[in-house]
């Protein structure tokens, strides 16, 4: 993934010869669309950035807050508001739908993540 790299835990994205430094907490989720990655953002001037690349190159560099539970999505678990049945509702009011098996895996990973966070803050 030549257009995405990481430095000091920030995600650095190059698009049209402009370099963006994105704090991970500003990423709501990432969506794979053919050869493009659509990075959905909060707290920034633009609500999304589109770059060319693959999740395969991204995943090893993301911290534990990111959930890769479906071939088309990587979700920032800090942005999850509700998980129910086969849908995840995000802080951006966007819903992401999954099949039962994928949803169960995502729910388990999310619950483990939340338990670790509670331990850190107690």
Model-predicted segments: where are they?
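Basic, polyanion-interacting recognition surfaces, primarily
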Residues: 1-122
């Amino acid at each position: 993934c030549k257009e995405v790299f990481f430095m000091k835990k920030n995600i650095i994205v190059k698009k049209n010869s402009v370099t963006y430094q994105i704090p991970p907490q500003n990423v709501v989720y990432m969506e794979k669309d053919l050869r493009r990655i659509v990075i959905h953002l909060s707290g920034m001037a633009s609500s999304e950035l589109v770059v060319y690349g693959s999740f395969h190159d991204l995943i090893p560099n993301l911290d534990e807050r990111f959930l890769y539970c479906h071939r088309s999505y990587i979700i920032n678990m800090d942005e999850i508001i509700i998980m129910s049945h086969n849908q995840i509702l995000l802080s951006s009011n966007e819903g992401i739908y999954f099949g039962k098996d994928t949803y169960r895996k995502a729910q388990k990973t999310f619950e483990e993540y939340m338990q670790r966070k509670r331990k850190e803050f107690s």
